[in-house]
Amino acid sequence: MKIAIDGMGGDNAPVAVIDGAIQALKAYDDIQLYITGPEEVLNIELAKYTYPKEKVIVVDAKEVISPNEHPVMALRKKKNSSIVKALNLVKEGICDAVVSGGSTGAFLAGCTLIIGRIKGIERPALAPIMPGRRGKFMIVDVGANVDCKPSFLVQFAKMGKIYYQKVFNVKNPTIGLINIGEEEEKGNELTKAAFKLLKEESSINFKGNIEPREIPTGDTNILVSDGFVGNTALKMYEGSASSILGIIKDEVLKSSIISKIGVVLLKPVLKNIMKKFDYKEYGGAPFLGVDGICIKAHGSSDARAFKNSIKQTKIFYDNNVLKDIRNEFSSEN
C-alpha cells in the first residue's frame, strides 16, 4: 500500500509527522510512504532515523497552506504546496491514500476538487470514530457541510453504515439522528425532513432521534447530523472529557493522604480511562464520499496520533471500504 503524507500538515509538523511515519513503517511492513514538503527540511528530519530507504519517497513541495488562508483560493494559488502535491499523488494513481494534519478547509476542499466525489454522492462527510461508554461510535458529519439538505444526511448514514460494518465487523449497525428531543416532530425543518427520509430508508437500521446527552453512551453506532451540529457535538465532547479528567487531577492534589493512596491503587484504571478518551489513540477521521482514501489527522497531532492516522488509512484500505461505497451508490444510479 502506498500512502501520501502531507509532511507539513499540522501544528507539530514536520517533526511529529516524520516521527509518526517512521513508527508506522516499523508497525506495518506492507506500506510505502510518499512524504510531501520542502525536500531539504524533510531530509533533515528523516536523517534522525534508521529505516528502509526504499520505503520512504520524499516529494518536494516548497509551499505550505496555513489554516488562516482561504481554502479554495490557497489551493489554486499554491499548486506546489504539500497538501496539493499529496492529493495529486492519489489523483494520479501513484498512491492509494492520503493523510494530512494541515488546514482542514484546504484538505477537504482539495479532496473534493482534486480527487473528486464518488458518483452519486451529493456531499462528502467527515466521520471521526469516538469513544463511548459501551463502545465506539462515529459522527457523520463534523464540519465538512455546515448547511445540508435532508438527502445529504441519508447518504451520510449509508456511508457510515458501510464504514462501520467493514471496520468493526458489525452486521447491522444502529443509526441515530442528533436532535434536541426523541420525538419525531422535534427539531428544525432539516431534522424533521431528514427523520422522515431516514425512517423510510429500508437499507439502514434507524433508531430515531438521539439527544446530545445520549451521545457519550456509545449505544448508537452511527450518529448523523449537519456539519455545524456535528462539529459542535464533537468539540463539546472532547472538551468535556478533558475537563473531567482535569477536575479529577485537581481534586487528587487537594485530597488527603488516605485519598491519595486510594488514587494510587486506582492509577491503572484512571490511566485506561484517560487512554480511552485520548484522540491520539483513534488517529484521523475518514472523509467519506470522495473517490479516494482521505484521512484528516487532528491539527495538534503528535507522533503517536500521526502513526494511528496511518493505521486508520490502512484499515480503510484493507477492508475495501472505498470499493463498497462506490458499489453502493453506483447501484442507485
UniProtKB/Swiss-Prot annotation:
GO molecular function, one term: phosphate:acyl-[acyl carrier protein] acyltransferase activity
Assembly and interaction partners: Homodimer. Probably interacts with PlsY.
UniProt source species: Clostridium beijerinckii (strain ATCC 51743 / NCIMB 8052)
Enzyme class: transferase
Descriptive protein name: Phosphate acyltransferase
Involved pathway(s): Lipid metabolism; phospholipid metabolism
Main location: cytoplasm
Localization of this protein: Cytoplasm
